[in-house]
């Protein structure tokens, strides 16, 4: 099964089991079960279709990890649309390049948890600086709680969801049924070390091959806990957070800032935790300092 089919299956097989948990402004966990998260994703899919998005067209998601990121990405998958992740730290020039080069028609804009209230580091303001140059962008959707751009292309999250009210779920499910293994699932942009970043095309078949390889080495069970903190624009984050999560129907806990990943891990006690070498060096240093302090 491809990832959209996995999401549908999870909603049927584990409707009341926890799917995704995110802390609210009061630091309280808010959890969607698989049935609720499927409905949430379906609403987004319907709105994408109502806005005229056709198979193989692109959307960009410019934000750090949050519920809308997962919903928009999987909604694109369900609609046979291509998702393009944009790092939450990207500058105006960088976001202009990725959105423009990918020919994204819709851009979803969220937050940068490390902006320190500096307007110039906020994704909405960085996109505003270049939106007039992105002629192929039809709509900019502000994620929940994000200030709306001063642009005629910008709409709120509520306005976006309302667009899909007249679209039938059957239209989305027909698109799921029409997905072929060789259809493009997403574009992941390279770091651009030697020039402008290049969009790497990954198909639904690519993801399934990756997931099969992971399962040859590791096996986690439905409902086991996982902490999401690697940026979802990164291939490792997308593999585990968006695809392996759905395949194994794990319970995803979303970190609201990469600065707090260790604190979240202590609280959640995840069965699965992924990271880059630097985070493990930090954990080791903290543990060693604590042990040495007790010696």
Language-model-detected regions and their locations in the chain:
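Conserved pre-ATP/AMP-binding loop-to-beta segment of ANL
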Residues: 15-18, 142, 154-155, 165-189, ...
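ATP-dependent adenylate-forming carboxylate-activation enzymes
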Residues: 63-64, 84-100, 111-121, 250-268, ...
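Structural core segment of the AMP-binding/adenylate-forming
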Residues: 78-162
């Amino acid at each position: 099964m491809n990832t959209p089919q996995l999401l549908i299956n999870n909603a049927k097989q584990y409707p009341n089991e926890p799917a995704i948990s995110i802390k609210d402004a009061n630091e309280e966990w808010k959890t969607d079960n698989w049935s609720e998260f499927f409905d949430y994703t379906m609403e987004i899919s319907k709105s994408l279709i109502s806005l005229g998005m056709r198979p193989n067209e692109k959307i960009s998601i410019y934000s750090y990890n949050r519920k809308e990121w997962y919903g928009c990405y999987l909604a694109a998958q369900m609609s046979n649309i291509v998702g393009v992740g944009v790092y939450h730290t990207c500058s105006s020039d960088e976001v202009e390049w990725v959105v423009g080069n990918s020919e994204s028609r819709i851009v979803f804009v969220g937050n940068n948890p490390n902006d320190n209230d500096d307007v110039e580091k906020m994704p909405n303001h960085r996109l505003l600086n270049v939106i007039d140059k992105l002629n192929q962008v039809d709509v900019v959707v502000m994620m929940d709680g994000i200030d709306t751009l001063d642009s005629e292309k910008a709409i709120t999250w509520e306005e976006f969801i309302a667009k899909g009210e007249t679209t039938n779920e059957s239209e989305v499910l027909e698109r799921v049924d029409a997905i072929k293994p060789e259809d493009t699932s997403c574009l992941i942009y390279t770091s651009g070390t030697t020039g402008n970043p290049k969009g790497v095309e990954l198909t639904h078949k690519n993801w399934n091959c990756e997931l099969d390889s992971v399962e040859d080495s590791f096996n986690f069970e439905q409902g086991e806990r996982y902490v999401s903190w690697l940026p979802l624009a990164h291939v490792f984050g997308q593999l585990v957070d968006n695809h392996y999560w759905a395949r194994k129907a794990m319970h995803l806990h979303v970190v609201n800032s990469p600065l707090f990943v260790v604190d979240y891990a202590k609280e959640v006690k995840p069965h699965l935790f992924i990271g880059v070498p630097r985070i493990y060096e930090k954990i080791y240093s903290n543990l060693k300092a604590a042990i040495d302090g007790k010696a």
